[in-house]
């Protein structure tokens, strides 16, 4: 993912948390905030220390980033997303992570995701 597609600063995370809408399934919580003036989407990732050690947390983040990269043409532009991973992610394969992300994005009202 390119740097312009990432949310890194704490105040940007807090804005999405406070003003955005949330949707969830057992594996992920996704907050989304509409930003009409922004021509692209941005993603912020959060994986708690409760999930596992650094190796496990980084593996989960890599799988989420790869899933987003594959789905980037179907994700609505002009939005900020914060994805929070929950404990069941630690034992999931890449295919399961991608399928779960598609499910939670569909629940959040994205019409373009078809997979």
From Swiss-Prot:
GO terms for cellular component: ribonuclease P complex. Pfam families: Ribonuclease_P. Transmembrane segments: none annotated. The keyword Aminoacyl-tRNA synthetase does not apply. GO terms for biological process: tRNA 5'-leader removal. Signal peptide: none annotated. Its EC number is 3.1.26.5. It catalyses: Endonucleolytic cleavage of RNA, removing 5'-extranucleotides from tRNA precursor. It is an enzyme of class 3 (hydrolase). Keywords: Endonuclease, Hydrolase, Nuclease, RNA-binding, tRNA processing. Consists of a catalytic RNA component (M1 or rnpB) and a protein subunit. RNaseP catalyzes the removal of the 5'-leader sequence from pre-tRNA to produce the mature 5'-terminus. It can also cleave other RNA substrates such as 4.5S RNA. The protein component plays an auxiliary but essential role in vivo by binding to the 5'-leader sequence and broadening the substrate specificity of the ribozyme. Belongs to the RnpA family. NCBIfam families: rnpA. This is Ribonuclease P protein component.
């Amino acid at each position: 993912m390119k740097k312009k597609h990432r949310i890194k600063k704490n105040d940007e995370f807090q804005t999405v948390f406070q003003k955005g809408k949330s949707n969830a399934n057992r594996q992920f919580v996704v907050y989304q905030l509409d930003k009409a003036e922004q021509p692209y989407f941005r993603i912020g990732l959060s994986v708690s220390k409760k999930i596992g050690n650094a190796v496990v947390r980084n593996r989960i983040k890599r799988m989420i980033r790869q899933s987003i990269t594959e789905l980037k043409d179907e994700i609505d532009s002009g939005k900020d997303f914060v994805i929070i991973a929950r404990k069941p992610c630690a034992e999931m394969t890449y295919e399961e992570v991608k399928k779960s992300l598609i499910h939670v994005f569909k629940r959040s009202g994205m019409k373009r995701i078809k997979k």
